[in-house]
């Protein structure tokens, strides 16, 4: 964790979107960032999120579903909310913490193609961030 920035992906249940974002973040940003995720609540990692990431050869079976940790939130360099609910109810962040919102549809309970689409959209967005810093 030495001298790496912290990026913290947040969504409602830390089950689907933020789990996939954490995995893509580790894939594209892991050399420069400590990549973490959490939720307003912890619903457990959705098995379809695991399956969707496995399709692109990324294993998230060891990731855990966690509630937002105030210490991590306060130390993060960048907080990214991935759904409107998390954006609205996320605890206030200190002025030095940059906070952005990248909205994605919630794939939970949707057909398989929605999981694949959201997975790919999140991956493309994080890849763009890795390449451009925005």
UniProtKB/Swiss-Prot annotation:
Superkingdom per UniProt: Bacteria
Name of one Pfam family that matches: LMWPc
Compartmental location: Cytoplasm
Taxon lineage: Bacteria, Bacillati, Bacillota, Bacilli, Bacillales
EC class name: oxidoreductase
GO terms for biological process, alphabetical: response to arsenic-containing substance
Enzyme Commission no: 1.20.4.4
Function of the protein: Catalyzes the reduction of arsenate [As(V)] to arsenite [As(III)].
The protein's name: Arsenate reductase
Cysteine disulfide links: 11-83, 83-90
Cytoplasm keyword on record: yes
SUPFAM superfamilies: Phosphotyrosine protein phosphatases I
Keywords for the protein's UniProt record, in alphabetical order: Arsenical resistance, Cytoplasm, Disulfide bond, Oxidoreductase, Redox-active center
